From Swiss-Prot:
The modification Phosphoserine is found at residue 112. It catalyses: a hydroperoxide + [thioredoxin]-dithiol = an alcohol + [thioredoxin]-disulfide + H2O. Homodimer; disulfide-linked, upon oxidation. 5 homodimers assemble to form a ring-like decamer. Interacts with TIPIN. The enzyme can be inactivated by further oxidation of the cysteine sulfenic acid (C(P)-SOH) to sulphinic acid (C(P)-SO2H) instead of its condensation to a disulfide bond. It can be reactivated by forming a transient disulfide bond with sulfiredoxin SRXN1, which reduces the cysteine sulfinic acid in an ATP- and Mg-dependent manner. Acetylation increases resistance to transition to high molecular-mass complexes. Deacetylated by HDAC6 which decreases reducing activity. It is found in: Cytoplasm. The lineage of its organism: Eukaryota, Metazoa, Chordata, Craniata, Vertebrata. Thiol-specific peroxidase that catalyzes the reduction of hydrogen peroxide and organic hydroperoxides to water and alcohols, respectively. Plays a role in cell protection against oxidative stress by detoxifying peroxides and as sensor of hydrogen peroxide-mediated signaling events. Might participate in the signaling cascades of growth factors and tumor necrosis factor-alpha by regulating the intracellular concentrations of H(2)O(2). Belongs to the peroxiredoxin family. AhpC/Prx1 subfamily. It comes from Cricetulus griseus. One of its GO terms (molecular function) is thioredoxin peroxidase activity. One of its GO terms (biological process) is hydrogen peroxide catabolic process. This is Peroxiredoxin-2.
Amino acid sequence: MASGNAHIGKPAPDFTATAVVDGAFKEVKLSDYRGKYVVLFFYPLDFTFVCPTEIIAFSNHAEDFRKLGCEVLGVSVDSQFTHLAWINTPRKEGGLGPLNIPLLADVTRSLSENYGVLKTDEGIAYRGLFIIDAKGILRQITVNDLPVGRSVDEALRLVQAFQYTDEHGEVCPAGWKPGSDTIKPNVDDSKEYFSKHN
């Protein structure tokens, strides 16, 4: 795995890529999403096994993300033509069916390399997930090895947590969910949280 140019707290590397959006080819730029949160997830290959479970799960929750002012983008090293063929394959046959999220083509592998998820010996991407805030700043990175899929619920929770901290200036403890207690980030005020939870 290459180190890439994606660093927490820094601007996310911009990109332009051809994507399949609503069954058609479209040029997509990260900068087009400025003002919104973005969940950018990489997956190894089309027509595989774990990948469709993740893509369909993200697609099924696309509206939940949009309600938070967040868009979801999927990326693999496959071409837009392969993406479209997979989308046009019925789910019962291992295809994706219609999607509510764009799938970006990274045939040059520049996105995967720039984001540090390229598995160079195979030329495919690890399962990287990046949360980018409305200002284009990278807030979260996770990278899974190939055989284990990611949790859409956890990605939603993380977006909600970062948005909460942005708005309220408080910090979110382990396992925080909307409506749960948060911590005021100073020594004296934080005792209010710790006295309730210990």
